[in-house]
Amino acid sequence: MTMFKEAVTFKDVAVVFTEEELGLLDVSQRKLYRDVMLENFRNLLSVGHQLSHRDTFHFQREEKFWIMETATQREGNSGGKIQTELESVPETGPHEEWSCQQIWEQTASELTRPQDSISSSQFSTQGDVPSQVDAGLSIIHIGETPSEHGKCKKFFSDVSILDLHQQLHSGKISHTCNEYRKRFCYSSALCLHQKVHMGEKRYKCDVCSKAFSQNSQLQTHQRIHTGEKPFKCEQCGKSFSRRSGMYVHCKLHTGEKPHICEECGKAFIHNSQLREHQRIHTGEKPFKCYICGKSFHSRSNLNRHSMVHMQEKSFRCDTCSNSFGQRSALNSHCMDHTKEKLYKCEECGRSFTCRQDLCKHQMDHTGDKPYNCNVCGKGFRWSSCLSRHQRVHNGETTFKCDGCGKRFYMNSQGHSHQRAYREEELYKCQKCGKGYISKFNLDLHQRVHTGERPYNCKECGKSFRWASGILRHKRLHTGEKPFKCEECGKRFTENSKLRFHQRIHTGEKPYKCEECGKGFRWASTHLTHQRLHSREKLFQCEDCGKSSEHSSCLQDQQSDHSGEKTSKCEDCGKRYERRLNLDMILSLFLNDI
């Protein structure tokens, strides 16, 4: 047996694993690794190894995860020493550093028997090592040349470890889960995965009793209770409780988006974001609500939806004690308390915290629509609305109702349709109890109770509750009639009036009387007809006291008393005393068409 003549240093007997390889060790293997490292260190101290600054180790209290990193060689190749550090991922407890001398003081009392000490002659070129290494851990033997990987130039102490590492580059996946068919490079990673779907959760949090399948998951979870954030961004100083969170955050500074969707070319910072985005193209909705059966692309959307059923408002404002179902809604609300509203609308006096919100609000008063469709010329306030509108021309639909199969150009329309399909009214007015399928419709309805009329006409000063009302009203001043009937060429100020008019040409009568089966073109005439069956007379003349079923009959009576011709034809401008006379003229005209 060839004996060594030169001094033995700690690097000569150090166990070296990469961070990736150490991440695959289970609890028992990590403990074994720690014991081997300490045993080697004790052996060096026992043979009189001289301490130096380069031999300093960094230990942390309650360490569970050890990483050995070999730093760059700081001295020349001729006899230079290599600095090594034993690091750990911090879990709980404050940081604490022990020097070699302190470790020696802690372990010297254990080295009482002569056989506990070893001499440098006990280390041979064949790599005689303590028995703890038999579990598969490799020692860098004195005089051995480490194995180098050709692609990343990474060095490994053992050829078997190099072979495992090469699987990361080659994509070779040899270990498959029989239940989920998920594949792994390492058998240890497969074992960890199998614990997850087997339901084995041995590690329990002492604070909240939450259980985990891996000890590392428990230690990461405990940072929520301790508030520890050991991973800090060097750019902005922001701290994170997870290393992965810091990596994702750092890409915000670099602008790196390495994960690209092959369907639409959109790029993402994280691979999980790409996978979630791809579900839009595939239509996959793996997260299903067990209450109503509705499915979602992401778990976060399911969690937000679940709050609707539970009526849970877990996010409370500390200033006014108002509660919200989502954190984003709470953050937006808190800005109303903390930020000064410097930007005031001159039209209605409403104030805003930022200029952008003021500019958006002013479009309600001006009716400005800078984004025009190249196909039909329709204008929109926002580019996003124009993009959604263009789907109508392209025939692109993004949402399909599971109940009736109807397709929609916008997800919001589809969700509103499904709520109406299920008669689901999620938003209720606290004043009158009326329910709505969307919060936007509820906000519009509440103006009826508050009397708010934020939209004022500059021509006549008339106020309106909704932007659509003032837009229709402005056409009375301008005389604009943008909606034209293709059958007869007649134009209208509103699209709804055009649709009603087209029923004259199509003969459509969607409103039918349940008593006699008679059909009507409009809901108003249907209601008027129903009063004939109920004998209800709601309209009474103040001059003679006579009651009528129709408001038109009341108007005719009042015209008889006053002699005024109140019924005017929109086509020729001629006036009639009775609405009935005008209707007869119009019917004759339509029969001639």
From Swiss-Prot:
| Name the UniProt record assigns to this protein | Zinc finger protein 284
Q: What does this protein do?
A: May be involved in transcriptional regulation.
Single biological process term from Gene Ontology:
regulation of DNA-templated transcription
Q: In which tissues is it expressed?
A: Expressed in lung, liver, pancreas and thymus. Lower expression in heart, placenta, spleen, prostate, ovary, small intestine and colon. No expression seen in brain, skeletal muscle, kidney, testis and peripheral blood leukocyte.
Gene Ontology MF term list:
DNA-binding transcription factor activity, RNA polymerase II-specific; RNA polymerase II cis-regulatory region sequence-specific DNA binding; zinc ion binding
Return the PROSITE patterns for the record: KRAB, ZINC_FINGER_C2H2_1, ZINC_FINGER_C2H2_2
Q: Which UniProt keywords apply?
A: DNA-binding, Metal-binding, Nucleus, Repeat, Transcription, Transcription regulation, Zinc, Zinc-finger
Q: Where is the KRAB domain?
A: 8-78
User: What are the residue ranges of zinc fingers typed C2H2-type?
Assistant: 145-169, 175-197, 203-225, 231-253, 259-281, 287-309, 315-337, 343-365, 371-393, 399-421, 427-449, 455-477, 483-505, 511-533, 539-561
Pfam families to which the protein is assigned, alphabetical: KRAB (PF01352), zf-C2H2 (PF00096), zf-C2H2_6 (PF13912)
Q: Where in the cell is it found?
A: Nucleus
Which protein family is it in? Belongs to the krueppel C2H2-type zinc-finger protein family.
**Source species:** Homo sapiens (Human)
Kindly state one GO CC term assigned in the UniProt record: nucleus
Q: Which domain of life is it from?
A: Eukaryota
